[in-house]
């Protein structure tokens, strides 16, 4: 009726569900996980972030390769033979598996380097900014560390790499780290690929949980972040709630927040 060329589902579909729906509607189908992965791919700026996103995309794609071949003509093979499409599909599976293995090896090397950096900072007081995507973590990092080079944008997933800057809080020196923002129903492939990055929060002496107080669903966002922190084993870390963007609230909103 709407003559749409693309249908997006706000949930993750299994390979068979995606395949069956595409056959039924005759349109390209994208689920929530694939859409978020595509957004991450657009935002990735460093080599580490690109590798992490590519790994998540490939692991998402692997069980769905057959569906991605449905637009090609298939030939039925005789006994003991395969059609050209099927042969190419098997080749693609091998290539994808090889690439996944290579990316995991490279990311392990990156993690070893990151561990060396952590060891060099073990005697410093470390705080990590965590929160729902676009809550304003990078803006707070820029303000507290007086670092104008910190990238700030009003959009989802503007930060994919942990970024650490020094901040002076009173007479104390703090290493403040910005982290990737969380979101409802974050694809499990992304959590796995970014685990080394996300686990920066486990090394923190204090978590600054940044909340966009102007968002009507901030309580749901807080619950999502708390859940992901628990999955990462960081739910026992000391947490300080930072309500951001309160200047956008009216008196009624401020009163509700105080309550």
Where are these regions (language model features)?
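Conserved P-loop NTPase architecture
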Residues: 1-127
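Flexible, glycine-rich phosphate/dinucleotide-binding loops
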Residues: 38, 136, 248-249
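Conserved G1/Walker A P-loop phosphate-binding module
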Residues: 68-206
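Residues in soluble alpha-helical coiled-coils and helical-bundle/repeat scaffolds
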Residues: 63, 67, 101, 185-188, ...
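Conserved C-terminal guanine-recognition region of P-loop GTPase G domains, centered on the G4
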Residues: 1, 5-28, 170-172, 194-259
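Short alpha-helical interface patches
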Residues: 32-39, 96, 188-194, 253-259
